[in-house]
UniProtKB/Swiss-Prot annotation:
The gene is DNAJC18. GO terms for molecular function: Hsp70 protein binding. (Microbial infection) In case of infection by polyomavirus, involved in the virus endoplasmic reticulum membrane penetration and infection. Regulates the recruitment of DNAJB12:DNAJB14 into SV40-induced foci and all cooperate to guide SV40 across the endoplasmic reticulum membrane. The foci represent the site from which SV40 penetrates into the cytosol. CDD domains: DnaJ. This is DnaJ homolog subfamily C member 18. Its main location: endoplasmic reticulum. It is found in: Endoplasmic reticulum membrane. SMART domains: DnaJ (SM00271). The chain crosses the membrane at residues 228-248. The lineage of its organism: Eukaryota, Metazoa, Chordata, Craniata, Vertebrata. It comes from the Eukaryota. It is a single-pass membrane protein. Coiled coil: none annotated.
């Protein structure tokens, strides 16, 4: 029995040494060996199994190889509890720091470059994190509520969520195109197009938003038309009143000036003050005797008011010229002020004399 155990121990040591050198004894292949159950045999079998599993897991997405560093990077992203951890920046990071972090991570975790399991989800998480944090409004809302929105695994759903309540308004693929023009800056690697339910959700949500916006615009159109009509209503009322007033108004029977367009072409004078005025061809038929006398009183009053206003304007003009001549010591202005005639004032003096004499 002791001899048997000694032989088994020697064979176990040889087997472990062969496993470590990645080869087996030529005379005893591992398939035909039945381990004895001792600690050394079990340890050797466990090391062999671990090595085989690691060799299998190095075959990533799309049967492409990946490095241990890439796998650890994907695992780090999946363990992150907020967008700041995903990008590896502080909560007070500036826009430039966010862009720098995104460029670095997007190139590192793009599925066409990183084939480790979960690289696609990690890449989408990076894009979503940058799209939210680079938007001031979304970042403010995320800072207030985002820490409560951790990743979770819903029943009958895939584990990847990455803060679905704070989805970006742009897909990770579109965001990558914005930064790198659809391909890597250092190679001719075309963009991947992995259309998942996140992309579908994004398109469906924005299609619903556009439809809702169109409905709201259509509902607002009648209200906008009504508001515009209410605003224009006062203007329309003024225009209508003005037109009606002009239609109902009658032209006066006289004019102090010659107006051929209105038919005031016949010249006349008042009997008392000899004030000139103009009438139309039908004036004599309408005004005679007392009616003519009353009308001429009205004409004289209007004429005196007109002459008084004109006289005041002439005096005002002469006074201003005199003041300017004294202020600037301008002899030319002084002469012009002195030569200015007050014709309407002279007419007014004559009318006052006639009224006193009458």
């Amino acid at each position: 029995m002791a001899a048997t155990l000694g032989s088994g121990e020697r064979w176990t040591e040889a087997y472990i040494d062969a496993v470590r050198r990645n080869k087996y004894p030529e005379d005893t292949p591992p398939e035909s060996h039945d381990p004895c159950g001792c600690c050394n045999c079990m340890k050797a079998q466990k090391e062999k199994k671990s090595e085989n599993e690691w060799t299998q897991t190095r075959q990533g997405e799309g049967n492409s190889t990946y490095s241990e560093e890439q796998l650890l990077g994907v695992q780090r992203i999946k363990k992150c509890r907020n967008y700041y951890e995903i990008l590896g920046v502080s909560r007070d990071a500036s826009d430039e720091e966010l862009k720098k972090a995104y460029r670095k991570l997007a190139l590192k975790f793009h599925p066409d470059k990183n084939c480790a399991p979960g690289a696609t989800d990690a890449f989408k998480a990076i894009g979503n994190a940058f799209a939210v944090l680079s938007n001031p409004d979304k970042r403010l809302r995320y800072d207030e509520y985002g820490d409560e929105q951790v990743t979770f695994t819903a029943p009958r759903a895939r584990p990847y969520n990455y803060y679905r309540d704070f989805e970006a308004d742009i897909t990770p693929e579109e965001l990558f195109n914005v930064f790198f023009g659809g391909h890597f800056p250092t190679g001719n690697i075309h963009m991947f197009s992995n259309v998942t339910d996140d992309t579908y959700y994004y398109r469906r949500r924005h299609r619903h938003e556009r439809t809702q916006t169109q409905k709201e615009e259509e509902e607002e159109k009648p209200q906008t038309t009504y508001s515009a009509f209410i605003q224009l209503l006062p203007v329309l009322v003024i225009v209508i009143i003005s037109v009606i007033t002009q239609l109902l108004a009658t032209n006066p029977p006289y004019s102090l000036f010659y107006k051929s367009t209105l038919g005031y072409t016949i010249s006349r004078e008042t009997q008392n003050l000899q004030v000139p005025y103009f009438v139309d061809k039908n004036f004599d038929k309408a005004y005679r005797g007392a009616s003519l006398h009353d009308l001429e009183k009205t004409i004289e009053k209007d004429y005196i008011d007109y002459i008084q206003t004109s006289c005041w304007k002439e005096k005002q003009q002469k006074s201003e010229l005199t003041n300017l001549a004294g202020l600037y010591r301008d002899e030319r202005l002084k002469q012009k002020a002195e030569s200015l005639k007050l014709e309407n004032c002279e007419k007014l003096s004559k009318l006052i004399g006639l009224r006193r004499g009458g």
